[in-house]
Each structure stands twice: as structure tokens, then as C-alpha cells.
């Protein structure tokens, strides 16, 4: 009986192995992983030269076997399914509190955020340099600052992850202490966890009209009202960045955006390119891999990019329906992409700056932006201030 069971087990194992080999052999290679938001390695070119090649980091070369190993990992059959099994085993079977620093609480995916003191201080210094170079002596320049809390601010304590997260109160206090020249706008009283996507880092545009109104009021403007907009739901289902990182199978969510005649008629220029009409990039409102006529692909993998399109260092939004000549300059990260359109109705022109994407850094900003007689808003999330070095 024991021999029979062993024989059956061996047949099952061999059968599974043959099935995986067959699927791997006959399936076409994937170009891009939408769950991981990354390109997948193709089969490496097989030549005598790269067979003999050794890994050499100084020359940026890899051996055939190194490239082949990366290819097999990326193109492994049912890769996403095995990633999900692994994640569920760690979180549910082993009862681990997180998966690589990411966790789920009350249906919301987020990550632990210990303080990165070095990056945080460098970013405060970068903001100070911008102030001293462009804002301090600019005539009639009104400077404001607001910090957007990440989801862990709301979830760390109830989920039991507060000991492994930074002291948010101290973080906000340090920002204010290092930027005494700015008029600080506290957003904590108009935000809660329901204002954020469940599977992504960002906030939901349809839920932050009150945030935009508080910012506008603090800057002396009337601000938007909910009735100024109609809500439009995008057709495709939205899966945020945490969906692929945590790898636990959960339902996607709807992505809504706010429409108005004012927003539809705005003229938007990205990095000096000719202006286009409207603040939304409808090509990016879907999830697909689009082949280019001359080879390669256009990847539309993050539906959040519908807001002010792709990452750009300098975006100019002109409002032809403005009843004022006031102008606003916003230094921002990706959170600003969905919020800034809500401020358009109170300004004739909004210049949007993301210093991370400006070629050559910020030392020549005054060639493109005049800061005199402007409202200037520094709008950064705790995520970026704590993890990504600003230029």
C-alpha cells in the first residue's frame, strides 16, 4: 500500500512538472506585468559570444545564463498565482503581520513607514534652497505649504504597526520648524482613510473637494464646491500599486474623476510641448499594452495617470474661462496631480513643478517661471518627503 501511494505521488509530481513545462514551452512570452508594473525579461539572444561572456558590472554585460535565469523567473507559468499563494501563506498561514513591509487593515493596503532621517533632512534642505533662490526675494510672492499624510498615518495604530512607523506628529512639527517662512495649511482635519484608494497610495479625487476648498480658502480664493462638478466613472477596474506589491488577491476598485466645462476647456502644456485641451489624459484611463507601428509598446498600466497625464517636471495649465488674472505655482509630487485641477477655477494660470523630473535640477527654474505676484503652494506627501530625494 505504501509503495502504491508513493508511486501515485511520484506520478502526480511528474505530471505537474510536465504540465508546467508544457505551459512554459507553448505559451507566448509576456512583455509586461500589470500587477508588478514592470517589463518582463525576454528570452536572451543566443550567440557564441554571450555564451562565453561573463558578468561584468563595469561594462554592463551579463552572461547568457544570468539573463536566462532572469527570463525564467519573469516568464514562469502562472507567476502571479504563485506570488499570491506565497503572500497568503505568509500573511494567513504563518500569521505574519506584513508582507515585505506592506500590510492590509480594514480592507486598505498600505506600508509601514519608519523615518528615513537622512532623506527627510535632505528634502528639507532642498525646499529651503528653493525658497532662498526663488521665493524669498520675489515681490508679492505668497508662500503656502501643506503636507499630505500617507495611509499609514490613519492605519498604523489600529493595526498595531505604530511601533514600526515614524512619529507623524514629530514629522509635521519638524516640517513647520524648518519652513517658518511658509503659511502652513493643516489638512488632517479634512482627511480620513476613506479619502484614499484601498489598493493604492493616493487619495480619491471625488473625495477631496473639501481639501481643495481648504487650500483655496487659505490662499484667499473662493475654492471649489462639490456641485461645480459631475462625477464620471472610468470603464476599467483600477488596481493600485499595492495590489501587485502585497500580491494578495482582492477586488479592484472604481476610479472616478470630476468633470466640468472649465476643466474640459483648460489648455495644458507638458514640459514646453504644444498645449492640449483638458486636464485629463483619456489614453491613460485604460489598462492595456499598445503596440507601436515601428516596434515597442505604449504601456497604459496605471490608471491614476489619467490625472494630468504622465510624470512631467513642468506643467502649465491655462484657464480661458478665468474671471481673475491671479496665478498659482505649485511644487508637488504625485498627490498633486488629482488635486490641482480642482483649484483651476480660481486662477488664470497654474504652473505645476515636480523637481524630481526636471532635467539638470532646479538651478534654472527662473528661466521658465516668474515667481513675482504669485501664490506659491508647496504640496508634498509624507511618503515623498520621507523616501524620495527632491532635487
What are the residue ranges of the model-derived segments?
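Extracellular glycan-modifying ectodomains
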Residues: 1-391
Amino acid at each position: 500500500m505504501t509503495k502504491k501511494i508513493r508511486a501515485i505521488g511520484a506520478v502526480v509530481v511528474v505530471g505537474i512538472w510536465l504540465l508546467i513545462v508544457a505551459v512554459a514551452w507553448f505559451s507566448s512570452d509576456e512583455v509586461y506585468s500589470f500587477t508588478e508594473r514592470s517589463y518582463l525579461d525576454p528570452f536572451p539572444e543566443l550567440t557564441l559570444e554571450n555564451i562565453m561572456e561573463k558578468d561584468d558590472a563595469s561594462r554592463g554585460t551579463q552572461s547568457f545564463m544570468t539573463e536566462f535565469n532572469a527570463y525564467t523567473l519573469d516568464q514562469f507559468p502562472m507567476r502571479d498565482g504563485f506570488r499570491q499563494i506565497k503572500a497568503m501563506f505568509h500573511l494567513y498561514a504563518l500569521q505574519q503581520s506584513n508582507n515585505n513591509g506592506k500590510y492590509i487593515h480594514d480592507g486598505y493596503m498600505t506600508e509601514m513607514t519608519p523615518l528615513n532621517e537622512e532623506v527627510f533632512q535632505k528634502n528639507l534642505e532642498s525646499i529651503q534652497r528653493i525658497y532662498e533662490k526663488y521665493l524669498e526675494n520675489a515681490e508679492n510672492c505668497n508662500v503656502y505649504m501643506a503636507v499630505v499624510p500617507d495611509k499609514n498615518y490613519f492605519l498604523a495604530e489600529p493595526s498595531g504597526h505604530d511601533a514600526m512607523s515614524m512619529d507623524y506628529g514629530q514629522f509635521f512639527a519638524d516640517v513647520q520648524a524648518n519652513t517658518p517662512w511658509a503659511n502652513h495649511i493643516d489638512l488632517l482635519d479634512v482627511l480620513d482613510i476613506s479619502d484614499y484608494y484601498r489598493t493604492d497610495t493616493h487619495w480619491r479625487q471625488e473625495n477631496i473637494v473639501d481639501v481643495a476648498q481648504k487650500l483655496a480658502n487659505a490662499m484667499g480664493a473662493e475654492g471649489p464646491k462639490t456641485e461645480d462638478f459631475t462625477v464620471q466613472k472610468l470603464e476599467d477596474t483600477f488596481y493600485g500599486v499595492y495590489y501587485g506589491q502585497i500580491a494578495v488577491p482582492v477586488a479592484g476598485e472604481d476610479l472616478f474623476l470630476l468633470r466640468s466645462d472649465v476643466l474640459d476647456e483648460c489648455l495644458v502644456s507638458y514640459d514646453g510641448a504644444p498645449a492640449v485641451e483638458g486636464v485629463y489624459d483619456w489614453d491613460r484611463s485604460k489598462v492595456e499594452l499598445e503596440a507601436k507601428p515601428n516596434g515597442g509598446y505604449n504601456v497604459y498600466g496605471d490608471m491614476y495617470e489619467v490625472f494630468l497625464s504622465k510624470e512631467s517636471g513642468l506643467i502649465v495649465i491655462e484657464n480661458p474661462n478665468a474671471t481673475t488674472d491671479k496665478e498659482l505655482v505649485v511644487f508637488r509630487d504625485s498627490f498633486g496631480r488629482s488635486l490641482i485641477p480642482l483649484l483651476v477655477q480660481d486662477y488664470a494660470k497654474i504652473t505645476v513643478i515636480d523637481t524630481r523630473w526636471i532635467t539638470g535640477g532646479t538651478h534654472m527654474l527662473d528661466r521658465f517661471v516668474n515667481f513675482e505676484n504669485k501664490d506659491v503652494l508647496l504640496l508634498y506627501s509624507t511618503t515623498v518627503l520621507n523616501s524620495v530625494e527632491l532635487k
